[in-house]
């Protein structure tokens, strides 16, 4: 059985930073992820997204952020395509993972957990489905085309800004107000090749000569419809997350998120959690906040495992 000071579940941006920070403090660490590559949701869904709320970067592509974080983990063990299914506690308080790994502490950084995009609630055909997308992993698909983006959150607005560089874009949202950054909305309004269609919902889809006739219904007006011809549809309705595995492990959840203390500890001994998997009063889902939570958690784990050691906080130490 392999032995480690710390196991991290989740190799998204926050999990990767936690692994590098743990290594900085000398913790023997192993990181698991169910996917076959690092980066989590960013890498799977929007690697080309310009992320603008990371300190020291006015803007950085999702895939570049993941790449830089991954470089920092070169001295830690990473086990991909491994979905952790079982954790148990030994008599000596160590944690046993999948009967193969014995660790002194566990850090959960699984984000939304197993997630699936919320699908477009309209009847479609296989031919139509070929033109309906739920991520922007391959932006070249949309180049020089007319694209309808459905949704009003940050992802929809970010995708619209990115695609506007090479495509004509419709953004369809059921409300007049968007849920994303006001700066993004203002920027989109200034672009001649972007049209914001509010308050509308998609009503029907028809395929005609390999183009989609998108029928939109104006919210609150029973007989008000418009039709737009597009080549591709990009759906940004958010995701359904599944954290049932955490419940099986006995971890306390609140609204499907992990409840943590000020030290990022869960209700279980030596089990901590960080990032978008957790909740506490005032928390907002931001990557940069997750980085800070990783530092708090690793510092707490160090004090838990090695109380006799004097912690060095590198950023401000002389």
From Swiss-Prot:
Protein keywords: FAD, Flavoprotein, NADP, Oxidoreductase
The enzyme's E.C. designation: 1.18.1.2
Binding site for FAD: 33, 41, 46, 84, 115, 276, 316
Cofactor(s) this protein requires: FAD
Cofactor comment text: Binds 1 FAD per subunit.
Enzyme class: oxidoreductase
Catalytic activity as recorded in UniProt: 2 reduced [2Fe-2S]-[ferredoxin] + NADP(+) + H(+) = 2 oxidized [2Fe-2S]-[ferredoxin] + NADPH
UniProt keyword annotation of Flavoprotein present: yes
Pfam families in UniProt: Pyr_redox_2
Listed InterPro entries: FAD/NAD-bd_sf (IPR036188), FAD/NAD-binding_dom (IPR023753), Fd--NADP_Rdtase_type_2 (IPR022890), Ferredoxin-NADP_redctase_2 (IPR050097)
Gene3D superfamilies: FAD/NAD(P)-binding domain
UniProt key word NAD: no
Family the UniProt entry places it in: Belongs to the ferredoxin--NADP reductase type 2 family.
Subunit structure: Homodimer.
Name used for this protein in its record: Ferredoxin--NADP reductase
Originating species: Lactobacillus johnsonii (strain CNCM I-12250 / La1 / NCC 533)
Upper classification of the organism: Bacteria, Bacillati, Bacillota, Bacilli, Lactobacillales
């Amino acid at each position: 059985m392999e032995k480690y000071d710390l196991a991290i579940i989740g190799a998204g941006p926050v999990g990767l930073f936690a692994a590098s920070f743990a290594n900085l403090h000398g913790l023997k660490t192993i990181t698991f992820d169910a996917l076959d590559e690092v980066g989590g949701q960013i890498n799977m869904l929007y690697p080309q997204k310009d992320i603008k709320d990371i300190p020291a970067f006015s803007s950085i592509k999702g895939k570049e952020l993941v790449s830089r974080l991954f470089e920092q983990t070169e001295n830690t063990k990473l086990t991909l395509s491994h979905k952790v299914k079982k954790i148990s506690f030994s008599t000596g308080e160590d944690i046993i993972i999948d009967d193969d790994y014995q660790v002194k502490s566990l850090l959960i950084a699984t984000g939304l957990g197993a997630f699936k995009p919320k699908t477009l609630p309209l009847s479609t055909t296989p031919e139509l489905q070929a033109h309906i997308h739920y991520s922007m992993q391959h932006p070249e698909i949309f180049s020089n085309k007319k694209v309808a983006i459905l949704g009003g959150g940050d992802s929809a607005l970010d995708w619209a800004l990115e695609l506007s560089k090479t495509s004509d874009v419709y953004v369809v949202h059921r409300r007049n107000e968007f849920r994303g950054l006001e700066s993004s909305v203002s920027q989109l309004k200034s672009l001649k090749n972007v049209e914001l269609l509010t308050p509308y919902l998609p009503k029907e889809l028809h395929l005609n000569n390999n183009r989609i006739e998108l029928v939109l219904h104006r919210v609150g007006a029973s007989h008000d419809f418009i039709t737009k011809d597009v080549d591709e549809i990009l759906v940004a309705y958010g995701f359904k997350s599944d954290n049932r595995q955490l419940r099986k492990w006995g971890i306390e959840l609140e609204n499907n998120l992990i409840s943590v203390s000020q030290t990022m500890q869960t209700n279980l001994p030596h089990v901590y959690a960080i990032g978008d998997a957790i909740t506490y009063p005032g928390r907002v889902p931001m990557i940069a906040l997750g980085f800070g939570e990783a530092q708090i958690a690793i510092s707490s784990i160090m004090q838990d495992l090695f109380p006799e050691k004097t912690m060095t906080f590198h950023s401000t130490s002389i």
